[in-house]
Curated annotation (Swiss-Prot):
Quaternary structure note: Binds ribosomal protein uS19.
Listed name of the protein: Ribosome maturation factor RimM
Subcellular localization, as worded in the UniProt entry: Cytoplasm
Alphabetic keyword roster: Chaperone, Cytoplasm, Ribosome biogenesis, rRNA processing
Similarity field: Belongs to the RimM family.
Entries under InterPro entries matching the protein: PRC-brl_dom (IPR027275), PRC_barrel-like_sf (IPR011033), RimM (IPR011961), RimM_N (IPR002676), RimM_N_sf (IPR036976), Transl_B-barrel_sf (IPR009000)
Organism phylogeny: Bacteria, Bacillati, Cyanobacteriota, Cyanophyceae, Oscillatoriophycideae
The protein's role, per its UniProt record: An accessory protein needed during the final step in the assembly of 30S ribosomal subunit, possibly for assembly of the head region. Essential for efficient processing of 16S rRNA. May be needed both before and after RbfA during the maturation of 16S rRNA. It has affinity for free ribosomal 30S subunits but not for 70S ribosomes.
A molecular-function term among this protein's GO annotations: ribosome binding
Gene assigned in the entry: rimM
Residues annotated as transmembrane: none
Length: 191
């Protein structure tokens, strides 16, 4: 199968083995529990390897109060086998993505979208990640826009609350997000 980054969606990362019978603890990166609870085909991607391998999800259940699922995968029968999968990503094909409501987005759609200041039109940076907490946060890699900043070796990143008041425009067709950053927010990337 051709490996195209856009055809895969990460749903979690295997963080450890659980018990002696091959169960795995998976840190979820999805808001859809059925991706762990409904058996079927998933893909495993080893660290530093762009080529996922198909595997069957046998079962999965959430750990109460945590963003962790305990899953069973076909062919993983003991703790030693489970331990070898630490750090692997669990993926689904993007054709399996659920339909979203208006103004809902999949994380993979937002990564690498350019971020502009809503009022000035100035290019500010690029979305590099999204953190799902109480309120979603966009992580933005800021561009260097002055000689002083260009001399800094440290990358400048900021977290922007992904709420309409701060992010009024998401235009995926044009690879553009516009933000109204509160005063001082962008300078936080300097520290």
């Amino acid at each position: 199968m051709e490996n195209n980054k856009n055809q895969w969606l990460e749903i979690g990362t295997i963080v450890s083995a659980r018990g002696l019978k091959g169960e795995l603890k998976v840190l979820s990166s999805t808001d859809f529990p059925e991706r762990f609870e409904i058996p079927g085909k998933r893909w495993l991607q080893p660290p530093h390897d762009p080529y996922p391998q198909a595997i069957e999800l046998i079962s999965g259940k959430s750990v109460a109060g945590k963003n962790i699922y305990i899953v069973r995968l076909e062919g993983i029968e003991n703790r030693n086998q489970a331990e070898t999968l630490r750090g692997y990503k669990l993926l689904i094909m993007d054709q399996e993505l659920p339909e979203l409501e208006e103004e809902e987005y999949h994380v993979s759609q937002l990564i690498n979208v350019q971020v502009y200041h809503h009022k000035t039109g100035e290019l500010l940076g690029t979305v590099i990640d999204l953190f799902t907490t109480g309120h979603d946060l966009l992580e933005i890699q800021l561009i260097n826009n002055s000689e002083r900043e260009a001399k800094k070796t440290k990358e400048r990143k900021v977290l922007i609350p992904f709420v309409y008041e701060i992010v009024p425009v998401v235009d995926l067709e044009n690879n553009r997000i516009e933000i109204n950053p509160p005063k001082g927010l962008l300078s936080l990337g300097d520290s």
